[in-house]
Amino acid sequence: LHYFQGSLEFRVRQGKQRGGVILADKARKQISILGGVLLVLVGVRYWLDRYELLSGDIKFKGQTTTGAGYTSANVLIPAKLLLTVIAVLCAIAFFVSFVVKDLRVPALATAIMLIGEVAVGGVLPWAVEQLSVKPNKANKEAEFIARNIKATRFAYNLRDDNLTVMPSFGKENAPAPQPGGKGVASTLSNIRLLDPNVLSPAFTQSKQLRSFYGFPDTLTIDRYHVGNELQDYVVAVREINPSALSGNQTDWINRHTVYTHGNGIVMAPANTVDAIVTDAGDRGGNPKYEVYDLQSLAAKQGQQHTTANNGTAHLDLREPRVYYGPLIAKQDPDYALVKTAGDSQEYDVEGENYTYQGKGGVHAGGFANRLAYAIEYHELNFILSNLINGNTKILLNRDPRARVEAVAPWLTADTSAYPTVIDGHIKWIVDAYTTLDSLPYAQKINLGEVDTDSQTARREWSPTMKQVSYLRNSVKAVVDAYDGTVQLYSFDEKDPVLRAWKGVFPGLVKEKSEMSEQLRQHIRYPEDMFKVQREILSLIHISEPTRRTPI
């Protein structure tokens, strides 16, 4: 640009006329400022590169380990510091040239910096790696592998005080438990006969109730007291299944204003079947269902409630309607319109409709709101429909996991939410994690790959959380299936990341002591976290760095 404006000339020396590159004063000043700013940014990049090296890769015995190795720690990091100083000095030279009207000094300084980048930042580290580190890899890298082990144990909560070693586990000569031994009877009686991974079709066939209801493909396990004993139950919420709607059920009014909520929770003791199967002709081996829904609630009205031990969980479910759940949320777009104009619109039970009474949802009335939703969902009915009035609400973000991540975007929700009954409502419990993607020296893992095994298909983690180097199950989230209320409770109060976020958002996460006793009874160790820790232990179960072997 300066060339075409005449501010920059390339002259050949003729007689007494000076040759070379001729810069006008305004061009020189601009180059001085731009060059100085550019070199300041280069210096900042060199400075930050030092920290990035702490999350680099160490190649050791065929295995890739996270962290700065011998060469990075002893050569590259000091080299980056030296280059930072050189870049800053070069920037100062450019700024000084703005006054002294001479670009030769900053040009020479820049050339020196480029030579230093090649020599100190490239040739020297290569020489140290090839001539010093590789011939003595075990000794040179041992200190840094030890740092990796320590940081990784901290990052995934696998420190010695959190681990219990079972010395007799897996040994052939380990003593067998005696039939009359402590806890043996209760353990044997609680052995699961029902597999939640394959039981969904049985629940659907027996307890679907209506064709537009459904259960998730994989059910879950929860614990309830039966008498004085704690017993495992296979549990599933009966939700609206958007993919099961057919015919006129799929039009806009029915899909979003009529079929708005599910109905109840279905359970079966995991250690019991209805009858023993002895041959192929027997019709036994099915779950012994316990159903808590609108119909069972109506049947109990007027009857004396009993708490006698008849082998059931006796759930005190007072609101079985389910407006929020992972199956409902598969509807695209995921919203429901409630409190619409006229008579009750929502299907409840056969022959009866219902009007939502919860505090959840956003007001959809008013022309501005209706226009905004019409644009958002490309749906003209928001403007044209007479069903939407000043009282109408729209229920959004109906996936419990999505609600948790919307309330606290700095948390990563577990790949599954499990239902339970607390305070008379069906509630979803979501394990939430604090994560970091580049904790120095901590081993990086791909969550999608680690969480996949023979029993579990690849799960859907948040797209931004494909790879992490820090994972703590620090928060338990509870989402009300009726009104969508989200409550967060701190569970790992020693987690420094959680403490930092609680300082940023005071009052958002409640203390662990504020958990109700009923909620505490349904807290479990997250399966996803267990799989991640299992994978990490397979890498660092040997604490001596020189004894580590390839995967």
Regions flagged by a language model, labelled:
Residues 1-543, 547-548:
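Soluble extracytoplasmic regions of secretory-pathway and membrane proteins
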